[in-house]
């Protein structure tokens, strides 16, 4: 298996969490959160990340309702994914992200209690969980 680099995005209207992962280790690391204004990110910041990490794949979390149906944020996340593809020519995959924010808060709380629960950290760890879910679904046993 080639070492593939994956960038993960947890799309939000005010903040977009970003993580980087390696397929060979099936693990990911939180990078940062990018501020967004009504879902519109700072594209220059994203361009720098794409240039720096040269991802083979970009995984964008897809916020679905618990019953699997789509909502307004699902459509906005898809639009964000499509724009990433159009602007940077990167291969895109969307990944079900139900419960990632809850799981991210639990993971951060284990590491540092309430002090660790800043919005930016939660978003970046959510992006980690999106990448890890992708790896598990595509390369797990």
Swiss-Prot record:
Its BP terms in the Gene Ontology are: rRNA 5'-end processing
Give the range the annotation lists for the signal sequence: none
Where does this chain mainly localize? cytoplasm
Q: Which GO terms describe its molecular function?
A: nuclease activity
Which UniProt key words apply to this protein?
Cytoplasm, Hydrolase, Nuclease, Ribosome biogenesis
Q: What class of enzyme is it?
A: hydrolase
Q: Which GO terms describe its cellular component?
A: cytoplasm
Q: Where in the cell is it found?
A: Cytoplasm
Question: What's its EC?
Answer: 3.1.-.-
Answer yes or no on keyword Membrane: no
Supply the InterPro entries for this chain.
RNaseH-like_sf, YqgF, YqgF/RNaseH-like_dom, YqgF/RNaseH-like_dom_sf
Q: Could you name the domain of life of the organism this protein comes from? A: Bacteria
Please name one Pfam family that this protein belongs to.
RuvX
Keyword NAD tagged: no
Gene3D superfamilies on file? YqgF/RNase H-like domain
Family according to the record: Belongs to the YqgF nuclease family.
**How is this protein named in the record?**
Putative pre-16S rRNA nuclease
Q: Where does this protein come from, organism-wise? A: Shewanella oneidensis (strain ATCC 700550 / JCM 31522 / CIP 106686 / LMG 19005 / NCIMB 14063 / MR-1)
